[in-house]
Amino acid sequence: VKVVATGGTGQLGRVLARELRAEGHEVVIVGRSAGGDVVPWDGRTLGPWARHVDGADVVVNLAGRSVNCRYHKHHLAEMMFSRVDSTRVVGEAIAAAAKPPRVWLQMSTATIYAHRLDAPNDEGTGVLGGFEPEAPGYWRSSVDIATQWERTLREAPTPNTRKIAIRSSFAMSPDR
């Protein structure tokens, strides 16, 4: 299986690539930290990196500015644009592919859900958050980012590719 991992130079991308390669899969890492076996991209525009999407079985987009920071306007804008722009351009690459991937796994976030103790949140019954009376303002910002991120995924014109938003929470790794 050929997997293209955009934004694949971060914590999750390194672990994913290592595990997939150990299973015998071909992995193409696309990232801003070019060098070695990393195909360079800027996360905003189509470029030579997009040719790797054509003929891939799976694309995994892990790109996005780290949330490990203070949530001031500048960082929130970086979080938003790094996620929305990279998702948009991955969609453009898939749409332009003569042989598009069967699956597009798109990182998202579980912070899209409301804080609740009465029931679990999932895709079928989950309650979107950000409007809880006791919620700090930055929660709303996180939900706005997640909502626009997933909207960009949904609206990508990729009819021959199954799109999956991965609503994960914090991921820890022995690599860091």
Segments the model singles out, each with a brief description of its role:
Residues 3-23:
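N-terminal Rossmann NAD(P)H-binding glycine-rich loop of SDR-like oxidoreductase domains
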Residues 6, 30, 59-63, 104-110, ...:
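SDR active-site strand-loop-helix element
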Residues 15, 19, 93, 152:
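Rossmann-fold NAD(P)-dependent oxidoreductase module
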Residues 25-33:
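Conserved glycine-rich Rossmann-like NAD(P)H-binding loop of the short-chain dehydrogenase/reductase
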Residues 35-89:
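NAD(P)H-binding glycine-rich loop region in Rossmannoid oxidoreductase-like domains
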Residues 88-139, 164:
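Conserved Rossmann-fold NAD(P)-dependent oxidoreductase catalytic core, especially the SDR/UDP-sugar
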Residues 112-114, 161-176:
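Flexible, glycine-rich beta-alpha linker
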Residues 132-165:
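Active-site Tyr-X1-5-Lys
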